[in-house]
């Protein structure tokens, strides 16, 4: 698995139109916190029990074949590593993790999107 900063991931997606951006956060994060424009939502895990989604790989396969590059993003770049490893194990050979994620880590005031992440870098995003 390769790792890209949010600006690198955005540039990669623009340069590779066959690449797919998968947002693996929970449904509530995706809908209410926001998500990168053009991303596909497939939860790695979700509430209320936060169990790993047993259909994750199959759901991603419906969106992208194992031959297409898959860029995967979560909140801060942790869940996306686990999700990316599952995709590699299933035969995906071009998996890219977005370092920093959509919101990045907490700052000194315990707020996200103030230090790093997709939103911090001013990349295109939307909310539902």
In which residue ranges do the predicted regions lie?
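Conserved G/P- and acidic residue-centered "switch" motifs that form tight phosphate/ATP-binding loops
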Residues: 23, 77
